[in-house]
């Protein structure tokens, strides 16, 4: 499946630039714009430093999760971007990658973005997909919730790939990542 003409369904925030350290914390909840963007336009938003999250119906919180068709994984340690790019799963399904604002040469930090084959309209399903991909890549465990903010990085030059997760793989991820009752 090719992402070239697939729209990314997210919310963006043009006033949260890079890591937004300090400043007005109300921006984390308010001011999000629900958009549908071609993957190249989404990459441009990230390259402007703009934050993104799932679309919301109101302020940004899990109870207001509306929909999304991507899952993002923060890699803060354990592998380099080059290692991630050569991973067989990424070779088949990775849609976009970029270095995060916290990236430094001695400790590479980057974000993997996977476009999904359909809209996720349930916060529980979004968490399941996020959880499964975080398990697969040993991603930052604090980034699994459905209303998570992902910060852009001005001048990060995101790399876009013409591939995405398939329906079959999405079903597997939903099964792997679903909450377990103990």
Where are each of the predicted segments found?
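Catalytic "initiation/cleavage/transfer" segments centered on a nucleophilic residue
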Residues: 1-44, 118, 133-182
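Signature for HUH/AEP ssDNA processing cores
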Residues: 1-108, 115-128
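Generic beta-strand structural signal
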Residues: 108-110, 148
